C-alpha cells in the first residue's frame, strides 16, 4: 500500500535525523540525509503508470567542514578543507576518519581512541626520507627519543680586526670586546666525537701591515697540543680579506675529533679601536633527549630536544577520495573505502596535491546544524502522521468494500 511506503520512508527519515542530532557533539561527525524517490507501477493492460509510493534510494553524507575549536592539546588535530586521517587496526584493516583525537600508547605509537594506529612515515634522527609513500606505516616516536650527538665539523667566525694594532692586549670575555686595540683572542666551545664539550682558543696576531696570523689551539688540560694550527691572512687596503678564508683544522687525535673547517668569511680589517666578534658559532651539539614535539600544518612532526635542537621525527599524510560521499560509514566515526568512492590518494604532505592542511591543537566538531535537523524532524513527523491518516482512510475504504458483500 502507498501509505505504508510513506510510513516506512518517513520512519527511516526520522531515524537519520535522530542519529544526526545524537551525534551533534561527536568530533568529526558528518551529517546525513536521505534521497527519496517516487515509485510507479506499470499496467499490463495499458501504457499508463500509477504512483506506488515512496522509497529511500540512498543516504547522502555531507562532507562540508565542521568548525575548528581550540583545545590546547598537542595531539588534537583538525583538518582544514579535504582529506582524512588514515588508520590501521591490529589486523591490518585500513580505515579513514576526520576525528583528530590522538594519543600515545605505551610503545609510543600514535593511536586513536579505539587503539587504531595513525599511519604516515617514520624517520630516525640521523636520516630523514619522506619521499616514499608506498611504505605507509604506524607512526612511532620511540626511535626518536634520543638525538645522537654531532661532533663539530665547522666553526664560523667573523671578526673586525684593528689595523692599528701593534702589540698584545688582554680580552674582556664578559662582553667579548678588546680592552685595547691590539691582538685578539676568543674561546670557542666545540664537541668531540663522544659528544663532550671542549674549548679551543682562536687568536689573531698581527705580523705586519695587512698581514695577520690566526692561531687555533686546544685547551685540553691533558694535551694542549691536541689541536694546534696556524694560518696566514692577508687583507687589501680596503680591509677586505684577499687570502683564503676557509681553513682545515687538524688534530693529533683523529679518533676524538671530526675534521673541522674554520670559516672566516666576512672577517675584515678596520681602523676602529673598538672590536667585537660579529659571528661566533659552530655546528656540533651533545646528545639530547626528546622534550616536546609539535605537529605543523604540512603534517611534519617536529621534535625539540633538551640540547635545544629540533628534528623532523615523523610525517602525517592525509588521504583523499574522488567520491567521498560513497565511503562506507563504520562504527567509531570511521569510514572504509568502496569501489564507488575510489581508491585513496595520499598526498606527499598536507597542503599539496589539493590536500587539506592540519590545524594543531584543534578539533573539528560535527557539521550537524541542529536548527535544520529540528525543522526536518517536524517535517518528517507531519509526513508520518499524514501517511498514517492515509492508511486509516484506505483501511476504512477496504472495510467498506468488504462489507458490501
UniProtKB/Swiss-Prot annotation:
Disulfide cysteine pairs (residue numbers): none
Keyword Protein biosynthesis set for record: no
Main location: other
Gene Ontology BP term (one): bacterial-type flagellum-dependent swarming motility
Compartments where located: Bacterial flagellum basal body
Annotated GO CC locations: bacterial-type flagellum basal body; bacterial-type flagellum hook; cytosol
Keyword vocabulary terms for this entry: Bacterial flagellum
PANTHER family in the record: FLAGELLAR HOOK PROTEIN FLGE, FLAGELLAR PROTEIN
Family: Belongs to the flagella basal body rod proteins family.
Name of the featured protein: Flagellar hook protein FlgE
Organism of this sequence: Buchnera aphidicola subsp. Acyrthosiphon pisum (strain APS) (Acyrthosiphon pisum symbiotic bacterium)
Lineage: Bacteria, Pseudomonadati, Pseudomonadota, Gammaproteobacteria, Enterobacterales
Gene from which this protein is expressed: flgE
